[in-house]
Amino acid sequence: MCASITAGKPVTLERVQSVADGLLPVRPGDLTFAHVTEFVDDVITVTDEEIIQAVKWLMITAKLVVEPSGAATAAAVLFASGGARLAHQGMTVAVLSGGNITHELLVSLFAETDRSSCE
């Protein structure tokens, strides 16, 4: 989506890869792009590592199991450098969605990085 916003029109990417597989269209739909153009003021991007940290933080701290795509909003608020912009704008709401995460993926996310890094 960021490439499309920058270009001012929907852009087709050659390849996309992320732990957040639900956020990986190679091209945003025309209607989605139109809505983003009209209603979105700012975009904060997050890394896969920040998303993984958010998945782990949500599970350990909030006792919520959220798939990586659904944890991207929490990653922006909790860990992304752009999240600091949110602190100056008053109340922030992060919608969490999706429990579509397998036990195997959840275990692998915890195995990839040290658990203490999200506490």
Question: What role is predicted for each listed range?
Answer:
Residues 1-39, 83-119:
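Glycine-rich phosphate/pyrophosphate-binding loop at beta-loop-alpha junctions
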